[in-house]
Each structure stands twice: as structure tokens, then as C-alpha cells.
């Protein structure tokens, strides 16, 4: 049984939440988000708190209701604070620049990689070797960061590539003569 799911999600002031069937809608100062909860999970809004319970006593329902509670908590946090991911670029000649709605990455290929920024995501480049991704939906922010990182993941010998801030890269030793 999930311990995460037992705790209700408190809806802070300035945020409105509504539950219609299996859809949870949350509206706050930064925007509006919605999430469709799985059919094996019951969702209720009572006294400014969203509670999540398994509908059946099956292993699947018990596994899903902790996930559903975490998703609803992410909706509330997203519309109040938002989410941010930071990426670092390491390597000679590796850099990032913003061009309108596109992020242009020079990652050692014969061509520059152009990434189109999706709706609801704001990307800033404070330095040519740093990328900040900000948005209200944690899944979209994480997906954008993972897609940008996948263009040139860090390699274990020199550590060159795109990595998350404070990510540990397991380094290997080169060949011995």
C-alpha cells in the first residue's frame, strides 16, 4: 500500500481545483492544468483538499493511487511555483543560443542541432554553456530536458556533452599501453 497516496493534497489559497469524474483541473496564478486519473482510482475534493483512494483492493489499484496523488500534487505545485530544470554543456566549441522559438545547439556535429521549443515552456540561456527550462507542467519540463540531453549525452571518458546540473558522470580511465 502506498504511503504517498494516503496523504491528501492541500489546495492553497489563490488556487482553484475541481474534480469532474476522473479529471482533476487546477487553476492558479501561473496557469491551468488538468490530469485524467486512472479508472482504478477514486478522486474527491473535500474542504480544500484532494484525496485519492484505490477503488478496488487490487495490486494495480494500490500501485496507481500513489502515482495519481503525486501527479495531482505536481499540478498544484506547477500552477503556484512552476518547475525548472537546468542543463550544462561541457566540451570545446559546444554552445547553445536562442533564436526566437528555437534553441540552436552546436554539439560537435557537422551541423547545428535546432530544437523547436514547445508551447508552455520558456527556455533561457544565461551563458552559452547553460540552459534553463521553465514551465508549469513537470512532465513536459522533464521531457524537454531529456530531449535536449539526448542530442549529445555526456560520455564517460572526457565528460563532454549535455548533462543535468549536478548530475554525476561516472568517469572511465582510457586504454593502457
From Swiss-Prot:
RNA-binding in keyword set: yes
Single GO MF descriptor: rRNA binding
Keyword RNA-binding: yes
Cited PROSITE patterns: RIBOSOMAL_L6_1
Short name of one Pfam family: Ribosomal_L6
InterPro entries reported for this sequence: Ribosomal_uL6-like (IPR000702), Ribosomal_uL6-like_a/b-dom_sf (IPR036789), Ribosomal_uL6_a/b-dom (IPR020040), Ribosomal_uL6_bac-type (IPR019906), Ribosomal_uL6_CS (IPR002358)
NCBIfam families: L6_bact (TIGR03654)
PANTHER family per the UniProt record, alphabetical: 60S/50S RIBOSOMAL PROTEIN L6/L9, LARGE RIBOSOMAL SUBUNIT PROTEIN UL6M
Family, similarity comment: Belongs to the universal ribosomal protein uL6 family.
Name listed for the protein in its UniProt record: Large ribosomal subunit protein uL6
Name of the gene encoding the protein in the UniProt record: rplF
Amino acid at each position: 500500500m502506498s504511503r504517498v497516496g494516503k496523504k491528501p493534497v492541500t489546495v492553497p489559497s489563490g488556487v482553484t481545483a475541481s474534480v469532474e469524474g476522473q479529471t482533476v483541473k487546477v487553476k492558479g496564478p501561473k496557469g491551468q492544468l488538468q490530469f485524467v486519473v486512472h479508472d482504478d482510482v477514486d478522486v474527491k475534493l473535500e474542504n480544500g483538499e484532494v484525496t485519492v483512494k484505490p477503488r478496488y483492493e487490487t495490486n494495480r489499484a494500490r500501485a496507481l493511487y500513489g502515482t495519481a496523488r503525486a501527479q495531482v500534487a505536481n499540478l498544484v505545485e506547477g500552477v503556484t511555483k512552476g518547475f525548472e530544470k537546468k542543463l550544462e554543456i561541457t566540451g570545446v566549441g559546444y554552445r547553445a543560443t536562442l533564436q526566437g522559438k528555437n534553441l540552436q545547439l552546436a554539439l560537435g556535429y557537422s551541423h547545428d542541432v535546432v530544437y523547436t521549443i514547445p508551447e508552455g515552456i520558456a527556455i533561457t540561456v544565461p551563458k552559452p554553456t547553460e540552459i534553463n527550462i521553465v514551465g508549469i507542467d513537470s512532465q513536459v519540463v522533464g521531457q524537454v530536458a531529456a530531449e535536449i540531453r539526448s542530442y549529445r549525452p555526456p560520455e564517460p571518458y572526457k565528460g563532454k556533452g549535455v548533462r543535468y546540473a549536478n548530475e554525476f558522470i561516472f568517469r572511465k580511465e582510457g586504454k593502457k599501453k
